[in-house]
């Protein structure tokens, strides 16, 4: 009995200590047991469909198939192992395959290694992402084929970035760890523990995003860098959201700063488990 109890404690300890990746539903801010999500962008001037996509999820909240139904029609498939971890992504009619492996680190973080493979060719590592115990991305490495200067700084041909978060799990800094580049910084405002406004500071300018109670963006304001204009807002976008009982968006209407509607509308529909 003592060994059984010890084993249970070790299992509990390992699941709480080591990183657990966020589900696709959480990353997409989709609520409830979503089984299928359909998204369509329509140009109201001529009723033409500009974008049409259907995404299917398993009961655990991860993508299993993504169908693009517009002019670039294709189907993206997601394969998982017996532990529910993503191990392969492939496209119908395409010989490109993405393969994933996992490394648990001594500090409790989890590194996901992404390899790209084409038919009759060696696989190549294109990214290594490390997540903390809360499933937050903290280190991002990605293949940098466009490097022109000081390329010897790259780590195995990859650039390296770090993410830093506040106590609510929202990003406050995004930084290049290999090259001298001014980091992108964020300030976050909350109401009752929910993010209601995020300001991004980068390249001397700033962008302000406002969110509703469901976490959906409802306003975007852009301020140009100093020396470009008088420092006032250069553009404003607002969105009117119609949501279902779960708080998922059914209709997304965009308006400019004069409250004039955009010529496109985004509509969503869902199937639930």
Regions found by a protein language model. Give the residues of each.
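Buried hydrophobic residues that stabilize the cores of well-folded domains
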Residues: 20-273
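Bacterial Sec-dependent N-terminal signal peptides
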Residues: 1-23
């Amino acid at each position: 009995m003592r060994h059984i109890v010890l084993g249970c404690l070790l299992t509990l300890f390992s699941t709480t200590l080591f990183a657990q990746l966020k589900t696709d539903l959480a990353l997409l801010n989709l609520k409830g047991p979503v089984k299928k999500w359909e998204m369509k962008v329509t140009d109201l001037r001529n009723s033409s469909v500009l974008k049409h996509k259907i995404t299917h999820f398993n009961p655990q909240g991860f993508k299993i198939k993504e169908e693009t139904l517009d002019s670039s029609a294709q189907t993206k498939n997601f394969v998982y192992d017996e532990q529910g971890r993503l191990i392969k992504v492939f496209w119908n009619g395409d010989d490109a395959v993405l393969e994933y492996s996992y490394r648990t680190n001594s500090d409790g973080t989890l590194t996901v290694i992404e390899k790209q493979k084409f038919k009759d060719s060696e696989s190549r590592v294109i990214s290594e992402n490390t997540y903390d115990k809360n499933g937050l991305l903290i280190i991002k490495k990605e293949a940098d084929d466009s490097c022109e200067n000081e390329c010897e700084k790259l780590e195995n041909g990859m650039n390296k970035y770090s993410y830093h978060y506040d106590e609510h799990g929202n990003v406050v800094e995004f930084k290049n760890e290999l090259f001298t580049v001014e980091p992108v910084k964020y300030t976050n405002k909350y109401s009752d523990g929910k993010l209601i406004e995020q300001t991004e500071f980068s390249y001397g300018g700033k962008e302000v995003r406002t969110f509703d109670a469901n976490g959906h963006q409802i306003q975007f304001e852009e301020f140009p860098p100093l020396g470009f204009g008088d420092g006032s807002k250069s553009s404003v976008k607002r969105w009117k959201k119609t949501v279902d009982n779960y708080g998922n968006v059914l209709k997304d209407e965009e308006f400019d700063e004069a409250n004039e509607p955009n010529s496109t509308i985004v509509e969503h529909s869902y199937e639930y488990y």
